[in-house]
Amino acid sequence: MLTIPRFVFPVSVMAVVALMLGGCGGDVSHRSQASGPSAAAEATHEVERLGVEVVARHSFDATSFTQGLEVTGDKLLVSTGWEGKSRIYHTTVDNVQSNSQDIDRRQFGEGATQVGNVVWELTWRDGVAYKRDAATLAELGTAKYAGEGWGLCSFSDVVVMSDGTDELRFLDPDTFAERSRVKVTLSGTPASELNELDCVTGDNGQRLVYSNVFLSTDIYRIDADSGKVTGIIDASTVPNNAASDPNNVLNGIAHIPGSDRFYVTGKRWPDLYEVRFVKPTS
């Protein structure tokens, strides 16, 4: 079976893939940024629509193929992808980096999250999660999981993982063993391509998961218990100043604790934006 990767092929290769899939009745339209109206345009009135207000812009590492972003104390935890270039590190909002750790050059790094004194870091197709010391990011061990790894976030008692499907997995924070799954739906329809994640506990105690959507500028707000998408943030107004490349898309969302603001960035983006999610003015 032909599978589509976590990055976009050059046009010449995509043409070959399209011909191959066309001959067997396949469809790659779900991977295209021009595949049709955004989820925000198709959602019903039951799903809250929000936009983005940019509060501040900070310098960011334009070489980082960002796969994970999270606020940890006074720093940001960043995990990156691409074979031979995947790493995890801490950085300040002024782009002062520390504790950089590479992974096996044959592996493609994915999302990461800190839970307690431990950081977990995913790989894309190797089924390996790295367990790291939260202070130094030194490797403490590994754990195995089935399928692909895309995004990670955590609450105090559970790690949440996406794998590109319409499911979120709930994992043990100590062993990474799977506890359960929930199907994610948008107005009753399966919502897939869930990518980088951020876990936020709302003012009412509700557990929310914010998810980038692969190759989209939409961000889903998901009720972690029911799996229902309760809000869609249209982040298309956030400036993408990355080099021209179809892979350099929005990816990376991190709530700033004690505030109504988030950090957002993208793959190989030179900027980190501090934003609020707001109701549209019109």
Where are these regions (language model features)?
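Short loop/turn segments that connect beta-strands within beta-propeller blades
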Residues: 91-96, 133-137, 172-176, 223-228, ...
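Bacterial signal peptide processing site
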Residues: 24-28
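Blade-loop segments of beta-propeller domains
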Residues: 95-149
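Beta-strand-rich domains and repeat architectures in extracellular enzymes and scaffolds
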Residues: 55-87, 101-113, 150, 266-270
